[in-house]
């Protein structure tokens, strides 16, 4: 039996690349967003707020990234899971959870290494920006 466990975390270098990829995509959509990238336990690694992004986007981006990292699920899917299983948000006892679309877990070699959250657009737009950013990881890794 092992006395310790090993965890993997996304690096700042990759977190900043994800942040920029999300911003680049938001720009093509004509959006101003906030982007947060957290490690696998929900601690902030990188954050950016585009000019003219609404202030509420700051908290929602961070909350979505945190939720995706802590649950290991897309935040939209996590909400569906909770509803289908009749789990109340208060029973989770975590006030940082943000159960709206726009947060995705970051996986590397099938391990959860972090979460990305976008705030400032609609849930669908935020999720799209996060998804495009994650797809860019493959491009950066070549």
What are the roles of these predicted feature ranges?
Residues 1-142:
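Flexible, solvent-exposed loop/hinge segments and secondary-structure transition points
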């Amino acid at each position: 039996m092992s006395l310790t466990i090993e965890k993997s975390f996304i690096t700042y270098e990759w977190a900043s690349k994800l942040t920029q990829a999300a911003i680049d995509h938001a720009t093509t959509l004509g959006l101003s967003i906030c982007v947060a990238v957290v490690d696998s336990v929900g601690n902030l690694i990188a954050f950016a707020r585009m000019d003219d992004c609404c202030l509420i986007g700051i908290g929602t981006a961070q909350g979505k990234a945190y939720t995706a990292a802590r649950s290991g699920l897309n935040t939209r899917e996590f909400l569906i899971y909770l509803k289908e299983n009749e789990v109340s948000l208060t029973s989770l006892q975590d006030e940082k959870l943000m159960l709206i679309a726009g947060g995705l877990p970051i996986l590397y070699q099938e391990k959860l290494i972090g979460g990305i959250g976008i705030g400032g657009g609609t849930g669908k737009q935020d999720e799209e920006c996060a998804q495009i950013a994650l797809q860019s990881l493959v491009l950066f890794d070549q």
